[in-house]
Design a protein with these regions (language model features):
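N-terminal targeting leaders
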Residues: 2-17, 23-198
Length: 198
Protein backbone atom coordinates (compact mmCIF):
# COMPACT_ATOMS: atom_id res chain seq x y z
CA UNK A 1 0.00 0.00 0.00
CA UNK A 2 2.75 2.48 0.97
CA UNK A 3 4.81 1.64 -2.13
CA UNK A 4 1.71 2.21 -4.27
CA UNK A 5 1.19 5.65 -2.72
CA UNK A 6 4.88 6.48 -3.12
CA UNK A 7 4.74 5.43 -6.77
CA UNK A 8 1.64 7.57 -7.34
CA UNK A 9 3.29 10.59 -5.71
CA UNK A 10 6.38 10.11 -7.89
CA UNK A 11 4.19 10.04 -11.02
CA UNK A 12 2.37 13.21 -9.96
CA UNK A 13 5.64 15.04 -9.29
CA UNK A 14 7.13 13.85 -12.59
CA UNK A 15 3.99 14.94 -14.45
CA UNK A 16 4.07 18.38 -12.81
CA UNK A 17 7.73 18.86 -13.75
CA UNK A 18 7.04 17.74 -17.31
CA UNK A 19 4.13 20.18 -17.62
CA UNK A 20 6.31 23.00 -16.30
CA UNK A 21 9.01 22.15 -18.80
CA UNK A 22 6.51 21.91 -21.65
CA UNK A 23 5.11 25.29 -20.65
CA UNK A 24 8.58 26.77 -21.15
CA UNK A 25 8.96 24.97 -24.49
CA UNK A 26 5.64 26.33 -25.68
CA UNK A 27 6.84 29.86 -24.99
CA UNK A 28 9.97 29.22 -27.07
CA UNK A 29 7.96 27.67 -29.94
CA UNK A 30 5.50 30.54 -30.05
CA UNK A 31 8.41 32.95 -30.32
CA UNK A 32 9.99 30.97 -33.18
CA UNK A 33 7.09 31.24 -35.62
CA UNK A 34 7.21 33.89 -38.33
CA UNK A 35 9.88 35.17 -40.69
CA UNK A 36 12.27 36.45 -38.02
CA UNK A 37 13.68 33.08 -37.03
CA UNK A 38 14.49 31.94 -33.52
CA UNK A 39 14.65 34.58 -30.82
CA UNK A 40 14.79 34.40 -27.06
CA UNK A 41 12.95 36.52 -24.56
CA UNK A 42 15.76 37.73 -22.28
CA UNK A 43 13.26 38.79 -19.62
CA UNK A 44 11.60 35.38 -19.23
CA UNK A 45 12.69 33.11 -16.42
CA UNK A 46 13.03 29.44 -17.27
CA UNK A 47 11.26 26.78 -15.24
CA UNK A 48 14.67 25.91 -13.80
CA UNK A 49 15.23 29.50 -12.65
CA UNK A 50 11.82 29.56 -10.98
CA UNK A 51 12.57 26.30 -9.15
CA UNK A 52 16.01 27.61 -8.14
CA UNK A 53 14.43 30.80 -6.74
CA UNK A 54 11.97 28.73 -4.72
CA UNK A 55 14.85 26.62 -3.43
CA UNK A 56 16.80 29.74 -2.41
CA UNK A 57 13.76 31.16 -0.59
CA UNK A 58 13.19 27.90 1.30
CA UNK A 59 16.85 27.54 2.32
CA UNK A 60 17.07 31.13 3.54
CA UNK A 61 13.81 30.98 5.54
CA UNK A 62 14.82 27.71 7.22
CA UNK A 63 18.36 28.89 7.96
CA UNK A 64 17.25 32.25 9.37
CA UNK A 65 15.10 30.49 11.96
CA UNK A 66 17.48 27.61 12.73
CA UNK A 67 20.79 29.47 12.84
CA UNK A 68 19.60 32.56 14.72
CA UNK A 69 16.88 31.83 17.31
CA UNK A 70 16.18 35.57 17.80
CA UNK A 71 15.04 35.80 14.18
CA UNK A 72 12.14 33.45 14.97
CA UNK A 73 10.51 36.46 16.66
CA UNK A 74 11.08 38.71 13.64
CA UNK A 75 8.81 39.36 10.67
CA UNK A 76 10.93 38.54 7.62
CA UNK A 77 9.85 37.90 4.03
CA UNK A 78 12.39 36.36 1.66
CA UNK A 79 11.87 36.89 -2.06
CA UNK A 80 14.25 35.55 -4.72
CA UNK A 81 13.97 36.53 -8.37
CA UNK A 82 16.58 35.24 -10.79
CA UNK A 83 19.02 34.78 -7.91
CA UNK A 84 18.55 38.30 -6.55
CA UNK A 85 17.31 38.06 -2.96
CA UNK A 86 15.21 40.70 -1.21
CA UNK A 87 14.75 40.69 2.56
CA UNK A 88 11.89 42.81 3.91
CA UNK A 89 10.15 43.04 7.26
CA UNK A 90 11.12 43.98 10.78
CA UNK A 91 13.86 42.85 13.18
CA UNK A 92 14.72 43.91 16.73
CA UNK A 93 18.25 45.28 16.15
CA UNK A 94 20.90 46.31 13.64
CA UNK A 95 22.87 43.24 14.73
CA UNK A 96 20.00 40.92 13.72
CA UNK A 97 19.66 42.76 10.42
CA UNK A 98 23.36 42.16 9.68
CA UNK A 99 23.06 38.54 10.85
CA UNK A 100 20.14 38.02 8.44
CA UNK A 101 22.33 39.20 5.55
CA UNK A 102 25.14 36.83 6.55
CA UNK A 103 22.85 33.82 6.93
CA UNK A 104 21.22 34.60 3.58
CA UNK A 105 24.61 34.86 1.88
CA UNK A 106 25.71 31.51 3.30
CA UNK A 107 22.46 29.74 2.34
CA UNK A 108 23.13 29.27 -1.39
CA UNK A 109 25.91 29.71 -3.91
CA UNK A 110 23.22 30.58 -6.48
CA UNK A 111 22.53 33.98 -4.88
CA UNK A 112 23.78 36.84 -7.08
CA UNK A 113 22.92 39.79 -4.84
CA UNK A 114 21.18 40.48 -1.54
CA UNK A 115 19.06 43.57 -0.89
CA UNK A 116 18.49 43.79 2.85
CA UNK A 117 15.60 46.19 3.36
CA UNK A 118 14.75 44.96 6.87
CA UNK A 119 13.65 47.69 9.27
CA UNK A 120 14.76 47.80 12.89
CA UNK A 121 11.28 48.05 14.38
CA UNK A 122 8.47 46.06 15.94
CA UNK A 123 6.35 43.76 13.77
CA UNK A 124 3.70 45.42 11.65
CA UNK A 125 0.06 45.04 12.68
CA UNK A 126 -2.50 42.89 10.92
CA UNK A 127 -4.13 46.08 9.64
CA UNK A 128 -0.82 47.28 8.15
CA UNK A 129 -0.32 43.90 6.45
CA UNK A 130 -3.84 44.02 5.01
CA UNK A 131 -3.12 47.52 3.73
CA UNK A 132 0.11 46.24 2.13
CA UNK A 133 -1.86 43.58 0.26
CA UNK A 134 -4.33 46.21 -0.94
CA UNK A 135 -1.54 48.56 -2.08
CA UNK A 136 0.20 45.72 -3.97
CA UNK A 137 -3.08 44.85 -5.70
CA UNK A 138 -3.57 48.48 -6.78
CA UNK A 139 -0.01 48.67 -8.13
CA UNK A 140 -0.37 45.39 -10.06
CA UNK A 141 -3.71 46.53 -11.50
CA UNK A 142 -2.21 49.81 -12.73
CA UNK A 143 0.66 47.92 -14.34
CA UNK A 144 -1.72 45.51 -16.08
CA UNK A 145 -3.67 48.44 -17.49
CA UNK A 146 -0.53 50.20 -18.79
CA UNK A 147 0.79 48.74 -22.05
CA UNK A 148 4.21 50.38 -21.64
CA UNK A 149 4.94 48.42 -18.45
CA UNK A 150 5.65 44.68 -18.83
CA UNK A 151 3.59 43.68 -15.79
CA UNK A 152 4.23 39.96 -16.33
CA UNK A 153 7.95 40.51 -15.82
CA UNK A 154 7.72 42.60 -12.65
CA UNK A 155 7.18 41.31 -9.14
CA UNK A 156 5.52 43.68 -6.68
CA UNK A 157 6.27 43.23 -2.98
CA UNK A 158 4.82 45.60 -0.40
CA UNK A 159 5.97 45.90 3.21
CA UNK A 160 4.83 48.59 5.65
CA UNK A 161 3.79 50.91 2.81
CA UNK A 162 7.04 50.51 0.86
CA UNK A 163 6.77 48.99 -2.62
CA UNK A 164 9.66 46.87 -3.90
CA UNK A 165 9.82 46.10 -7.62
CA UNK A 166 11.83 43.14 -8.94
CA UNK A 167 12.46 41.64 -12.35
CA UNK A 168 14.66 41.66 -15.43
CA UNK A 169 13.65 44.75 -17.43
CA UNK A 170 14.96 47.72 -19.39
CA UNK A 171 15.73 50.97 -17.57
CA UNK A 172 12.73 52.60 -19.27
CA UNK A 173 10.39 49.81 -18.09
CA UNK A 174 11.77 50.07 -14.56
CA UNK A 175 11.27 53.83 -14.46
CA UNK A 176 7.74 53.51 -15.83
CA UNK A 177 6.80 50.88 -13.25
CA UNK A 178 8.29 52.95 -10.42
CA UNK A 179 6.39 56.06 -11.56
CA UNK A 180 3.12 54.12 -11.59
CA UNK A 181 3.74 52.70 -8.11
CA UNK A 182 4.74 56.11 -6.71
CA UNK A 183 1.33 57.54 -7.60
CA UNK A 184 -0.69 54.89 -5.73
CA UNK A 185 -2.26 56.10 -2.50
CA UNK A 186 -0.79 54.42 0.57
CA UNK A 187 2.70 54.03 -0.94
CA UNK A 188 5.36 55.56 1.31
CA UNK A 189 8.34 54.82 -0.95
CA UNK A 190 9.30 52.80 -4.03
CA UNK A 191 12.48 50.72 -4.16
CA UNK A 192 13.73 49.34 -7.48
CA UNK A 193 15.43 45.96 -7.07
CA UNK A 194 15.68 45.29 -10.79
CA UNK A 195 18.24 43.64 -13.01
CA UNK A 196 18.63 45.70 -16.16
CA UNK A 197 18.84 44.50 -19.76
CA UNK A 198 20.60 47.60 -21.05
Amino acid sequence: MISSITSTVKHIVASALLLAALGSCTTVLVRTTGAEGITEDPTARTAGAVVEDQSIETKVVVNLKKLEPELKKANIKVISHNGVVLLVGQVASDGLKARATQITSDSSTKIKRIHNELEVAGKTSLLARSNDNWVATKVRTLMLANSSVPSGQIRVITENGAVFLMGLVTQANADGAADLARNVSGVTRVVKVFEYLN
